């Protein structure tokens, strides 16, 4: 909800504009694939429940996103972002969301395994319903690894600490989350590279908002940033960045061009309110503003 001016009534918020959309890290990546690049060679698995879940499924179908729905008894959550435009700040209000029970978790594992094609790219991004614990994530990874799938990961918190022990092929992580989990400072490239090597991670991508990102791998080390900052509203920019990066890799782009495209997608996301609400023309506008350089660790 967009607030363009202060409220005249204390403790009462009346919005000036509402931007309603189905959201979630996986869905944001799917939206970048489908709506921005017209790419449909993917399937996004949603854990859905209740009336909100039915709305999510309906909107995904309307936007021609390729999704698979797994239903649970609880209801999906509604989150609200209050954008105080006149103060250039935002307040995010997140509901706790549904709880997934033991039987539902076991059913989901079977559902997930049946959907897998050996050797495909698996993207694990964001969170899961309450009750889905670290041990459940490890079971999910076991299934993926048994099918020789490439693991592309963007998670935080306890899951992040556990997943790195499984040496994902690509780990994309926010710099603040990286520091909180592993104690490595933002500018400490040498420690980042030592971390990558010690955990046998092929591609380590660390993002830092408007300050850009670094991509560390055996082939090369790169830094990228946008030379133009259009807005401080960046909700969904990390997901848009990841979507652009994955699309670039899928299309066989070089590391430099994939990172350039990813950075352009992250910047394009700030043009409009709402996660991944930009178009290809926005990416074409921002990509010339992206700087990519080789770095040394």
Give the ranges of each region predicted by the language model.
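Conserved phosphate-binding/catalytic loop of the ribokinase/pfkB sugar-kinase fold
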Residues: 82-118
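Short beta-strand scaffold segments in enzyme catalytic cores
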Residues: 2, 80-82, 212-216
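Conserved phosphate-binding/catalytic region of the ribokinase-like
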Residues: 161, 189-297
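Conserved phosphate/ATP/ADP-binding segment of small-molecule kinases
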Residues: 135-222
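Short beta-strands and strand-loop turn motifs
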Residues: 92-94, 119-127, 154, 170-175
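Positively charged, low-complexity intrinsically disordered leader regions
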Residues: 1-9
């Amino acid at each position: 909800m967009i607030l363009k001016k202060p409220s005249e009534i204390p403790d009462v918020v009346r919005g000036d504009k509402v931007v309603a959309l189905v959201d979630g890290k996986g869905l944001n990546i799917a939206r970048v694939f489908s709506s921005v690049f017209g790419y449909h060679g993917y399937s996004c698995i949603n854990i859905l429940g209740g009336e909100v879940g039915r709305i999510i499924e309906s909107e995904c179908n309307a936007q021609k996103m390729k999704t698979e729905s797994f239903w649970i008894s609880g209801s999906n959550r509604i989150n609200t972002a209050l954008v105080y435009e006149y103060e250039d700040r935002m307040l995010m209000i997140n509901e706790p969301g549904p709880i997934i029970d033991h039987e539902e978790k076991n059913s989901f594992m079977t559902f997930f395994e049946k959907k897998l094609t050996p050797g495909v790219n698996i993207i694990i991004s964001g969170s899961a319903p309450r009750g889905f614990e670290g041990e459940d994530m490890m079971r999910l990874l076991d299934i993926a690894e048994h099918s020789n799938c490439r693991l592309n990961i963007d998670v935080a918190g306890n899951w992040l600490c556990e997943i790195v022990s499984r040496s994902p092929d690509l780990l994309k992580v926010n710099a603040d989350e990286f520091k909180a989990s592993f104690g490595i400072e933002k500018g400490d490239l040498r420690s980042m590279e030592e971390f990558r090597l010690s955990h046998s991670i092929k591609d380590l991508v660390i993002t830092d908002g408007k300050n850009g990102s670094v991509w560390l791998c055996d082939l090369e080390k790169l830094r990228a940033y946008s030379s133009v900052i259009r807005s401080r509203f960046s909700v969904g920019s990390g997901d848009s960045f990841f979507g652009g990066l994955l699309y670039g890799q899928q299309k066989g782009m070089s590391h430099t061009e994939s990172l350039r495209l990813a950075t352009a997608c992250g910047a394009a996301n700030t043009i409009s309110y709402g996660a991944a609400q930009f178009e290809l023309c926005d990416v074409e506008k921002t990509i010339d503003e992206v700087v990519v350089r080789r770095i040394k660790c």
